[in-house]
Amino acid sequence: MKVLISSPCSASVIIQYGIKSWPIWECEPSKFQWNYDDKEICLIIEGRAKISTQNGAIYVIKAGDLVEFPAGLNCEWEVTKSIKKHYRLGS
């Protein structure tokens, strides 16, 4: 399973999808396991994290990135700089 990253996310995409009205999630530097039961699309507002998947892929996400996590993904998050994101679950 692949994590898709669009960097930087354009202002037109933010407006088109109404991203600024999506809920916000925040996390201090930490390391934890996460399983995505549903697809998630998120816009990283602040911070940085390293995402390591079970198949050995490593992704670094940062402020300005639009990220899509597929349903069924199991991964480890390592938040290296306090992160804040708008997110939407499902299709």
Ranges and model annotations:
Residues 1-3, 7, 21, 84-91:
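Double-stranded beta-helix
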Residues 55-71:
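Short acidic-glycine-tyrosine-enriched beta hairpin
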Residues 36-51:
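Short, conserved beta-strand element in jelly-roll/cupin
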Residues 71-91:
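Ligand-binding loop in jelly-roll beta-barrel domains
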